């Protein structure tokens, strides 16, 4: 909590007396005295706000019982409200008094009274206060009855002006001056969570003028971002996209907020990840290439920092899937070329990967996989010596579309041909060991081919036992370069779940495989992915078996 200055209490009484004196007299001396003390009074209001914003409304009224009186006198002093800075601070203080969830009629009444003061300040921002008072009286309303409606009307009027609506029946457009836009956005900072103000917030965010510089305050963008991320305000997607376009820190904060939800707690299931990603509105916003590039760069950084952690890879792949879905909903034909989203990759490779692998009929999947493998291999191995950007960029593009890896494993294990296609071997080795040089990758492909042949021979030779399968997966000690352990486990688990012979021994095999927490987490991830694919990608899988195994393993870690 902010510390109360030692002399703030005495200052409080001093300014309350001053406001009463200014209220009772309207002489030139009083006006001169007000102007003389205005800067000091504004500083006092700032100090009060720093204190009030750390307290709830009940605590404020207990500590400062006459705070409403002080702020009301301030609101009705035209010399004080003549300064935009005073308007802004007074509104901030008033918002601190608002009870966000009133439980009694007294609290609701206090909120209505504060709303009246807020509408009065906004009316002072728009019109001469004497005109407002005369207009109110001519309608036969008391101010306390009129102001709640005035606030809504003021918001609607400002929204209409911002949107260039026709005024007074004249076919002309009215645009606010940049200085007034800035002032209005600052006034709205503490109001962004109030339902009556939401249309104005949306109009400000989607306002597009011709000014070369931003006309809204950074504090306004920050306040809207904070309210949106804490779910205190609901905004249409167009307003959120505009917010992120106009204020880069807001986009970065939203992306970090998503990362925190995805990665900071215990492992999220993939379906929960998908819900979080969609609710963030980032995939919809990323249909704009400029936003996508920033979010993608942040994914890249996390991927590098975590050394390709499975949870980060899964989140990136789900995000990409949600993006592709959003692009298809927005327009059947891409508004932007795919190269705009992935500028460091060959357009033909991007186009091939962006196809829906799950939509390819069974029996027609090998050729697209081999085509992708060839394009990736050309991109990776044709780069000049000493250049590491192309291999990483190609791998980073590839991991966005993880569905192709699933298909490659299926094709490798379920095909009847004696020899595994070299293109599939290269694709899997590259996915799991992207840092390898060409010669190392070739050696890994040889070992992977031997391993796949051993597993398939064992599968076709008769009754399958768990121990025989696990022994066949172990690399001989004399192997110069054993296959990546993660890839070996992926092949084993796929074989166990995708073949009838594997179903009979899957419990025993998985029990022996899960000998460390790290491997257990890896198996949990595979099972979760199996359930996710069966639900979303129309891939047949043993759902019941995977669900039972997943529940059992999750209880162990």
Curated annotation (Swiss-Prot):
Write down the InterPro entries for this protein, in alphabetical order.
Answer: FANCC
Q: Any transmembrane segments, and where? A: none
Report keywords, A-Z: Cytoplasm, DNA damage, DNA repair, Nucleus
Q: Where in the cell is it found?
A: Nucleus; Cytoplasm
Supply one GO BP term. Answer: removal of superoxide radicals
**Chief subcellular site?**
nucleus
GO cellular component term, pick one: Fanconi anaemia nuclear complex
Q: How does it assemble?
A: Belongs to the multisubunit FA complex composed of FANCA, FANCB, FANCC, FANCE, FANCF, FANCG, FANCL/PHF9 and FANCM. This complex may also include HSP70. Interacts with ZBTB32. Upon IFNG induction, interacts with STAT1. Interacts with CDK1. Interacts with EIF2AK2.
Task: Tell me the function of this protein.
Answer: DNA repair protein that may operate in a postreplication repair or a cell cycle checkpoint function. May be implicated in interstrand DNA cross-link repair and in the maintenance of normal chromosome stability. Upon IFNG induction, may facilitate STAT1 activation by recruiting STAT1 to IFNGR1.
Q: What protein name applies here?
A: Fanconi anemia group C protein homolog
Q: What organism does the record attribute this protein to? A: Rattus norvegicus (Rat)
**Encoding gene (name):** Fancc
């Amino acid at each position: 909590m902010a510390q109360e200055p030692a002399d703030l209490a005495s200052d409080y009484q001093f300014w309350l007396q001053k406001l009463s004196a200014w209220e009772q007299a309207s002489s030139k001396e009083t006006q001169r005295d007000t102007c003389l003390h205005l800067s000091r009074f504004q500083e006092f209001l700032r100090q009060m706000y720093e204190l009030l914003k750390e307290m709830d409304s009940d605590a404020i009224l207990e500590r400062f019982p006459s705070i409403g009186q002080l702020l009301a006198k301030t609101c009705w002093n035209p010399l004080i409200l003549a300064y935009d800075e005073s308007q802004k601070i007074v509104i901030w203080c008033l918002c601190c008094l608002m009870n966000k969830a009133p439980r009694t009629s007294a609290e609701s009444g206090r909120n209505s009274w504060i709303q009246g003061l807020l509408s009065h300040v906004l009316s002072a921002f728009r019109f001469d206060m004497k005109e407002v008072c005369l207009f109110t009286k001519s309608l036969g309303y008391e101010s306390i009855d009129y102001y709640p409606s005035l606030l809504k009307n003021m918001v609607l009027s400002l929204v209409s002006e911002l949107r260039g609506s026709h005024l007074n029946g004249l076919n002309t457009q009215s645009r606010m001056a940049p200085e007034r836009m800035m002032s209005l956005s600052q006034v709205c900072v503490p109001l962004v969570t109030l339902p009556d103000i939401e249309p104005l917030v949306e109009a400000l965010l989607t306002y597009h003028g011709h000014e070369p510089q931003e006309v809204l305050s950074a504090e306004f963008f920050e306040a809207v971002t904070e309210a949106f991320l804490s779910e205190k305000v609901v905004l249409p997607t167009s307003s959120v996209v505009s917010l992120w376009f106009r204020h880069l820190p807001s986009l970065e904060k939203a992306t970090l907020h998503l990362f925190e939800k995805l990665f900071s707690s215990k492992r999220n299931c993939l379906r929960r990840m998908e819900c979080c990603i969609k609710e963030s509105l980032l995939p919809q916003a990323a249909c704009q290439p400029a936003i996508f590039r920033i979010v993608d760069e942040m994914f890249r950084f996390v991927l590098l920092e975590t050394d390709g952690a499975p949870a980060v890879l899964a989140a990136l792949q789900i995000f990409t899937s949600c993006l592709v879905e959003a692009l298809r909903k927005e327009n059947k034909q891409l508004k932007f070329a795919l190269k705009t989203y992935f500028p460091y990759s060959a357009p033909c490779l991007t186009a091939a990967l962006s196809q829906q692998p799950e939509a390819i009929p069974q029996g027609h999947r090998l050729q697209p996989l081999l085509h992708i493998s060839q394009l990736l291999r050309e991109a990776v191995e044709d780069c000049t010596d000493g250049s590491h950007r192309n291999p990483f960029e190609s791998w980073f593009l590839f991991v966005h579309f993880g569905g192709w890896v699933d298909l490659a494993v299926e094709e490798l294990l379920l095909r009847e041909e004696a020899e595994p296609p070299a293109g599939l071997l290269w694709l899997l080795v590259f996915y799991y060991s992207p840092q390898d040089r060409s010669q190392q990758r070739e050696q890994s492909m040889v070992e992977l081919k031997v391993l796949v042949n051993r597993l398939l021979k064992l599968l076709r030779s008769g009754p399958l036992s768990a121990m025989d399968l696990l022994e066949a997966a172990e690399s001989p000690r004399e192997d110069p370069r054993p296959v990546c352990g993660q890839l070996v486990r992926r092949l084993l688990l796929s074989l166990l779940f995708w073949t009838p012979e594997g179903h009979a021994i899957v419990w025993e095999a998985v029990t022996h495989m899960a000998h460390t927490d790290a491997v257990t987490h890896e198996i949990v991830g595979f099972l979760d992915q199996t359930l996710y694919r069966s639900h979303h990608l129309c891939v047949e899988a043993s759902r019941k078996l995977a669900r039972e195994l997943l529940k059992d393993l999750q209880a162990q870690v």
